[in-house]
Amino acid sequence: MPAQGADAGVAWHYGEPVAEQRALEAGRAVVDQSHLGLVTVKGPDRLTWLNSLSSQELASLAPGVSTEFMILNPQGRIEHVASAVDDGETVWLITETAAGLAAHLDRMRFMLRVEVADVTADWAAIGEPVSSPAAGRVSWVDPWPRIADGGTTYAPADGIAPALRSWRLVLVPRADLVSEIESRIGAGAVLAGTWATEALRIAAHRPRAATEVDETSLPHELDWLRTAVHLHKGCYRGQETVAKVHNVGRPPRRLTLLHLDGSGADLPSPGAVVTLDGSDAPAGRVTSVSRHHELGPIALAVLKRSTDPSATLMVVGDDGPVAATQEIIVNADGFSADRPPKPGPTTKGLLLGKGCAADGGDM
């Protein structure tokens, strides 16, 4: 059955969604991820250039090491998210906004020795439940939920840890996509759809650009400082807001996992309004939803940070309200695990608007 929405273009499932999830969780599945976009950046200045534009430390990225980064606007809102791996000559970027990202990067080349190309038409990604790089292939291994160097988390210290999952994307010529998948099936892999990948992603608290990000999203709200933001690197656009929210705390919203009442047959749709039980006032919205083979119906939702973490919520579905309880991903107090005890010299400058030149400051 074909997927819809953000996963349109590949299969939602192949007739046995529960078995497909179990196979994926057990490490013996293969997933068509050819709907994802691919952008390449070549040239001797590629790493230092991307480092200057993005939220991640990329200047010293070693070949074969997987990371991810964001392109932020001057207010620190998320514009693009990319998974990145360098093969020694080319940085490969896997993204859900390939055309927009490639256009933005191309505008920022100036006189630097870099070449940007959207290669989505020629290359495709295959998903596998593996936590190590593919030998002899360009592959990206998901770093989530490990806290990368320079990162931090907004998860509560006594909260439920994200479910562990192994996941990598192997890049192949698009002309070879079918034969590459068939070879894996011949070796014993089970073909799984995006129902399986989404269920395991949601259970892992893993945000996704196509679903959790909107025009006002801050990285802190989604716990994305784990893997996509380096707090101690040099200047980039949006850095002042990143530093300010990290130091002061209290981002406006927070990502949470919802355990939905499973008594109904249908699940709410992404975009469904979330309210407090007994209230009509919106507290947030559902961003991703799936039926997990063990946890049942689950969803990710972005809520107002002030929403009581212990409150029972109601999700306004097409067939009526659905009760939901919260599994906290981002602390309701809005403070990260390593929030500085008091502002230091750098923070003072940032708070006065005198920080990063890319944000219009006078650094």
Enumerate the language-model features and the residues they cover:
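Residue-level signal for inorganic ion chemistry
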Residues: 43, 93, 127, 238, ...
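Anionic-ligand-binding alpha/beta catalytic cores of soluble enzymes and soluble regulatory domains
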Residues: 171-259
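Glycine-rich, small/acidic residue-mixed loop/short-helix segments
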Residues: 225-229, 239, 243-363
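Acidic, low-complexity central loop/insert segments
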Residues: 30, 38, 80-207
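Acidic, proline/glycine-enriched N-terminal capping motif
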Residues: 1-68, 77, 355-357
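Short, intrinsically disordered, mixed-charge
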Residues: 51-59, 103-111, 183-187, 279-281, ...
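Glycine-centered loop/turn motifs
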Residues: 63-65, 142-150, 205, 210, ...
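Short glycine-/aliphatic-rich beta-strand segments at the starts of folded cytosolic domains
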Residues: 29-52, 115-133, 250-262
